[in-house]
UniProtKB/Swiss-Prot annotation:
Gene Ontology biological process terms, A to Z: cell population proliferation; cornea development in camera-type eye; developmental process; embryonic cranial skeleton morphogenesis; face morphogenesis; keratinocyte proliferation; myeloid cell differentiation; negative regulation of apoptotic process
Record field: compositional bias (Basic residues): 27-37
Region (Disordered): 1-63
Domain bHLH: 66-117
SS bonds (residue pairs): none
Taxonomic classification: Eukaryota, Metazoa, Chordata, Craniata, Vertebrata
Protein name: Twist-related protein 2
Stated role: Binds to the E-box consensus sequence 5'-CANNTG-3' as a heterodimer and inhibits transcriptional activation by MYOD1, MYOG, MEF2A and MEF2C. Also represses expression of pro-inflammatory cytokines such as TNFA and IL1B. Involved in postnatal glycogen storage and energy metabolism. Inhibits the premature or ectopic differentiation of preosteoblast cells during osteogenesis, possibly by changing the internal signal transduction response of osteoblasts to external growth factors.
Listed CDD domains: bHLH_TS_TWIST2
Quaternary structure and partners: Efficient DNA binding requires dimerization with another bHLH protein. Forms a heterodimer with TCF3/E12. Also interacts with MEF2C.
SMART domains documented for this protein: HLH
GO molecular function: chromatin binding; DNA-binding transcription factor activity; DNA-binding transcription factor activity, RNA polymerase II-specific; protein dimerization activity; protein domain specific binding; RNA polymerase II transcription regulatory region sequence-specific DNA binding
Keywords from the UniProt entry: Cytoplasm, Developmental protein, Differentiation, DNA-binding, Nucleus, Repressor, Transcription, Transcription regulation
Length: 160
């Protein structure tokens, strides 16, 4: 327990910190993470370093702008990848024609569909002929899942 309080992250022991210092620490650590390249050049984020950020040179402004552009590109790619994954998931899950599923609804329905398929595999209700034709098997499962949903085994809430 003593070793955790004297970690390298907080150089001052918890006994020697005032409330004011504790309030400043999260802000300082937040800035250090945000400007990790800048603060790691000289080893520590100092108040003098903040003064230089107030009047950035043309090079640092361009550098920050290019970093922001790259971050935006990465975020767009991540969002596009996520949307493509949800589109693929929506194609797999049997839905009703009236369904306009949000992402959370899609995930919840997918989880319920997996549970439904597991129950189907565990039961002897389906005969072995279904495995001979995957298209027919998929259509039967889709129909059975739709009936299962309509019977109220799983109701979709509009608030989710």
């Amino acid at each position: 327990m003593e070793e955790g309080s004297s970690s390298p992250v907080s150089p001052v022991d918890s006994l020697g910190t005032s409330e004011e210092e504790l309030e400043r620490q999260p802000k300082r650590f937040g800035r250090k993470r945000r400007y990790s390249k800048k603060s790691s050049e000289d080893g520590s984020p100092t108040p003098g370093k903040r003064g230089k950020k107030g009047s950035p040179s043309a090079q640092s402004f361009e550098e920050l702008q290019s970093q922001r552009i790259l971050a935006n590109v990465r975020e767009r790619q991540r969002t596009q990848s996520l949307n493509e994954a949800f589109a693929a998931l929506r194609k797999i899950i049997p839905t009703l024609p009236s369904d306009k599923l949000s992402k959370i609804q899609t995930l919840k329905l997918a989880a319920r569909y997996i549970d439904f398929l597991y129950q189907v595999l565990q039961s002897d209700e389906m005969d072995n002929k279904m495995t001979s034709c995957s298209y027919v098997a998929h259509e039967r499962l889709s129909y059975a899942f739709s009936v299962w949903r309509m019977e109220g085994a799983w109701s979709m809430s509009a608030s989710h």
